Amino acid sequence: MRTPYDFDPGCTRRASVFTWLAMASVVTTVNLAYAGENFTVSSADFSDGGKIGSRQIFNDAGCKGPNQSPSLTWRNAPATTRSFAITIFDRDAPARGWWHWAVANIPASVKSLPENASASGALRKLGAIEARNDFNIDGYGGPCPPPGNPHRYVITVYALNVDTLPLAQGRPAALFDREISGSTLGSAQITVTYGR
């Protein structure tokens, strides 16, 4: 079947130029979509891949630390973020791992938490809620692994597509994790270690 381009060689060239421009436009759009910086989290108390700060260690079960939740700062969350959540999980604990902290309903305007935000009441002032961790206490519970190899603690800040999750203070951290997973737009992680 013939097309209009069969009758005018110039049309073929023009069609090729238009096709190339359309493709260039798509490539430019894709590149612009990825031109922004990545969603990241950092702490003044430790660095990714390093050891957790001494002030974050639990104060029980053979550990003698101040048990202060870490300072955290996050940047470049998705533009449509409506709230944030944070978890700290020991991936090397036996069986299913160990939840040290889960926080939800942090307002989207917040970009950092000070050290000890859990015990100091700073999170409550923001309207955030904290889960019951695997030490069976509400709020933050720092690292305190059994003696032996160091454990890895994954700290994750989640950007969520809802203002609040249907959770209540003191519900299990695993339940927080399920609700967070269902509303996540993006996440940023750092991993730190601690051993005795």
Label for each model-derived stretch:
Residues 11-12, 31-33:
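N-terminal twin-arginine translocation
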Residues 19-29:
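Bacterial N-terminal signal peptides
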Residues 16-18, 155:
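Solvent-exposed aromatic/hydrophobic patches embedded in short alpha-helical segments
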Residues 1-13:
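N-terminal secretory signal peptides that target proteins for export/translocation
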Residues 5-7, 18, 34:
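Aromatic (phenylalanine/tyrosine) cluster motif
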